[in-house]
Amino acid sequence: MFIDTAKIFVKSGKGGDGSISFRREKYIAFGGPDGGDGGKGGNVVLVVDPNMTTLLDFTYKRKYKAEPGGNGAGSKCFGKNGKDLHIKVPMGTIVKDVETDKIMADLSKPEDSYVVAKGGRGGKGNCRFTTPTRQAPDFAEPGMPEEERWIKLELKLLADVGLIGFPNVGKSTLLSVVSKARPKIANYHFTTLKPNLGVVSIEGVNNFVIADIPGIIEGASEGVGLGLDFLRHVERTRVLIHVIDISSVEGRDPYDDFLKINEELKRYSVKLYDRPQIIAANKSDMLFDEEKFEEFKTKVEKHGYNKVFKISAATKQGVDDLMKEAARLLSTIPVTDLEISEEDRFIEEEKRFTYSIRKEDNTYIVEGSFVDRLLNAVNVNDPDDLRYFHKVLKNKGVMEELMEMGIEDGDIVRLNDFEFDFLL
């Protein structure tokens, strides 16, 4: 079974809360604040495992959660950091955010990793808020919240050469001849239901990986048949070998097949269509009219395809020359990473200090994660806490934005359930 897409839920660890604590020692009646910071929450990290070849594991487990950070304690004890959760994925995995459908990462190298959900920062303990005028703060920061999201994993094969062509033209047979791969081979459409990989090793040329891409049919670029699920596997290949049944024993027209497959490639991706393509006229051992090959070759050469090889995968005729040409072409084409446009790239939102302000009559409502975090940290009924509260609003630009919106003396500012009268 080949699983090439998976959807999983990931959740990082929440940051530990800062501690509100004061020294309690014999003979020290009024000890100062000594609340420690909370620990950082664990990250969820995707890590490439070169030994993995499918996303099958994610059909059995779909939810992953990292450890939260420990809370701070007295005596300036810091909370323990939560452990990162490492999730292994195969090379060639594309990571997408489900909500936005944007690409987060392309994990195509053995050493690649990506933090898909960042752990929350630990909150500061009350000892961090001591100033010359505030020597006994009785508030501390809560830990930053965890990140959670659904992500989609897409596996795109890391093959150098892709075999394309209609079903039943001999791609699987060719793969079995040039490598040690043993794909399922039979005489019916869609024999290959998953891409098969093999390593081509020919004396005098560098080894390369070749993939037998499942049969493409007319309409594949629109999802017909095996469609888009398998076209995506061709995207990473640097050279395409287009296998054609030149024998016409099934009543197919080789030239018509050639045009239809290339039309599907062009509709799916112009870049894919422009990739170097070698034509392999297969089943030549069953061709009884040599003029048919010459006629076919002349027609495809008019489209700019000058590398046309007459082969027979069954008898191995012409196969070595075909593979050597593929190796030669590969040596001229550098390996490139997947290009991610700005439109498709996922941009992480800044979640630490986010807020918005809206006006209802003479009331200005401030809301957002910043507001929740601030109100959780302070006691608005305590004068020292309230002074700190107003200082934070000023430092973070809330007061300035309120004045730009035209707030006047006596107007009400509301943050969740807390309200105060604005004074210039």
From Swiss-Prot:
- Subcellular location as annotated: Cytoplasm
The record's Gene Ontology cellular component field reads: cytoplasm
Q: Which keywords does UniProt give here?
A: Cytoplasm, GTP-binding, Hydrolase, Magnesium, Metal-binding, Nucleotide-binding
Query: What PROSITE patterns does the database record attribute to this sequence?
Result: G_OBG (PS51710), GTP1_OBG (PS00905), OBG (PS51883), OCT (PS51881)
What's an example Gene Ontology biological process for this entry?
ribosome biogenesis
Q: Which residues bind GTP?
A: 165-172, 190-194, 212-215, 282-285, 312-314
Q: What molecular function terms (GO) are annotated for this protein?
A: GTP binding; GTPase activity; magnesium ion binding
Give every Obg domain span: 1-158
Which cofactors does this protein require?
Mg(2+)
Which EC numbers does the record give?
3.6.5.-
Positions bound to Mg(2+)? S172, T192
Its domain of life reads Bacteria
- Residue ranges annotated for the OBG-type G domain, each copy included: 159-331
Q: Chief localization class?
A: cytoplasm
InterPro entries named among the record's database cross-references: G_OBG (IPR031167), GTP-bd (IPR006073), GTP-bd_Obg/CgtA (IPR014100), GTP-bd_prot_GTP1/OBG_C_sf (IPR036346), GTP1-OBG_CS (IPR006074), GTP1_OBG_dom (IPR006169), GTP1_OBG_dom_sf (IPR036726), OBG_GTPase (IPR045086)
> Where in this chain does the record put each OCT domain?
345-424
Subunit field text:
Monomer.
* Family of the protein in this entry: Belongs to the TRAFAC class OBG-HflX-like GTPase superfamily. OBG GTPase family.
Describe the task this protein carries out: An essential GTPase which binds GTP, GDP and possibly (p)ppGpp with moderate affinity, with high nucleotide exchange rates and a fairly low GTP hydrolysis rate. Plays a role in control of the cell cycle, stress response, ribosome biogenesis and in those bacteria that undergo differentiation, in morphogenesis control.
Q: What protein does this entry describe?
A: GTPase Obg
Write the lineage as a comma-separated list.
Bacteria, Bacillati, Bacillota, Clostridia, Eubacteriales
